[in-house]
Amino acid sequence: MKRFLIASSLAASAMALAAPSLAQDKAPAPAAAQDPQFSQPYIDVDEWRDAPVRHRYVHGGFKGTETLFSFYFPDKAHYQGRFFQHITPVPDNENLAQKMPMGEENKIGFSIASGAYFIETNGGGRDQVGMPGKPNDFTLAAYRANAAAARYSRVVALQMYGGKRPYGYAFGGSGGGFRTVGSIENTEGVWDGVVPYVLGSPMAPPNLFSIRLRAMRILNDKFPQILDAVEPGGSGDPYAGLTPEQASVLREATKMGFPTPSWFGWKTMGIHGFAALYGGMLQADAGYFTDFWSKPGYLGHDDPKVFDGYRLQYDSGVATPITALEAAQAKLNVSIVNGTKNGGVDNAFAALQGEEGRRIVAFRLTGAPPPVYFDGGDLIVQSGAAAGKRLTIARINDDIVILGVVDAAVAAQIKAGDTVRVDNSNFLAAETYHWHQVPPASDNYPEWDQFRTADGKPIYPQRAFLLGPLFTAATTGKPFGQPPMTGRFHGKMILVENLWDREAMPWQGDWYRKRVEANLGAATNDNFRIWMTDHALHGDSAQQEDPTRTVSYLGVLQQALRDLSLWVEKGVAPPANTDYRVEDGQVIVPATAAARRGIQPVATVSANGGVKAVVKVGQPVHFTAKIDVPSGTGKIVSAEWDFEGAGTFPVKAKLPAPGARVVLSVSHAFSKPGIYFPALRVASERDGNAASPYARIQNLGRVRVVVE
């Protein structure tokens, strides 16, 4: 596949596309070579706007391509010579930032408050999504479209502000983390540094979703007791009371890196990104799904009875197709994600659904499939214009099958009267795909050692190739057959991972760190940091799934960008790496802020002196909290109590002057019996600015109270 490699030695005047030659930094970054496919930029909107703050909005694209961009420039008084560029998980929309509310989530407001202009693009266009087997040049979406926008933004910025070459920093999470890493590894002189976050590894897709599918099905009714064991004041033994099969599945998922406390979302988290990966998986390795049920060494062949009561093969007819407009009118939820599609890491893949009102999103069948546990399947068309085709089913609602990520043209061919089969056989087969994807031991994936014999050989038959690296290469823009992520880059990087992340298990950040260390050696500490965020999930949004359990990590990302710019521009080293160890797939951090390091505060809460208190109705419980910030990383600016699980944190603690250590004490009585998990949410800010909505680093402390 043809690739345009980004060179590192072209003069700045050539990059500037006929812009005037301007003085550069004393030690300038290498100039970014012009990509010939993006040689004709144009601007179709150029205007000043007042929301969320005063800025100049510039929209345009590149002739001969589908790439579109938006630039958001502050006035000269607020510009400090840099830009921040967000990279979405998949090619999306260049106007996403305009839809974000005021406050912490607003990328335009944050960038301008940080002296930067902001860049976003459509990633080259929706048609450029990288998947194995797609005919398009996946380097466009991986990094070239974003690089072209970054290069051209400097032309516009220099014309507006004059002065020196703007420094540039990119950030992106999940699939956008892959694209961010690919961007810095494949180029030189475009970005001076990057902040990838919730980053996976080349072995992540689809394997870290397949183990999740299996665990969700087999442990479905056991999660309440598993969670109770690992909650504050619990037994600490999540395996107690499980059958041998259930214990084996939980142990397997845990060793693969799934954070046990994060199973609290078992009812709502669904299959997540597997909805987008399944189509590529089926295209690249279709034989697996027949081998699974027909060949020795595969669970479906060797022990098919374990799927009794779960396997669904239901023949029916189509009563009527349902369009997106009709679904909305009937208040039928057909989204494959919870919440709004805004390019965030928890929902960007849903953009692949499309949005047109006439798009077919579901079918009403002539009968309702029998009720079984169902986390996805196929609608196999047996007659009509689409005979022989299959569409992914996200879920079943009585006699309505709701589609997942599908080919809209195929869905439109299916008419009333066509015969179809609802079949979840492939999704059941996918549950153990990771058994048959054991990487070489030299690739440093100890999480797969559980699928090897004592002499290091795979226990199960292996597929002809490893699928994960193919998916990843299509996202990072590396040639197939070469390492998708090398750890070799020019610039500086701060990597942010989350300890409760159930989509990108945090051990993968350590995997990439080892790649960086192998390439940079003694220079690693001068160019790389990794920060782990406790109580944080995958999604990059201010509102998290359960606020009494989890916190937003947006403040960590924002501080990482600010620290990165100081590191590059002024030589000010950022705070140290989080101290951690990886043990059986789990990332474990020290209990105190001083030992943990990184930038996140640590809140230690007690109830009547312990992690668990047992009291009578109306009897006051005495809560104490010690809050510490790692040295030199900020001051505590807020502390909020939520005693009864409302998720609103209604009790605001009165703080002394902002400081790096705070001790709190409060009492609360419960009016009803039950089990409560009171939580204290705290936030630090680098300068102790309690009024700023940005770069507030959050954490939680929790205890258990049993009221009799």
Question: Could you say what each language-model-derived stretch is?
Answer:
Residues 24-640, 646-696:
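C-terminal His-loop and adjacent cap/lid subdomain of alpha/beta-hydrolase
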Residues 1-22:
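Gram-negative bacterial Sec-dependent N-terminal signal peptides
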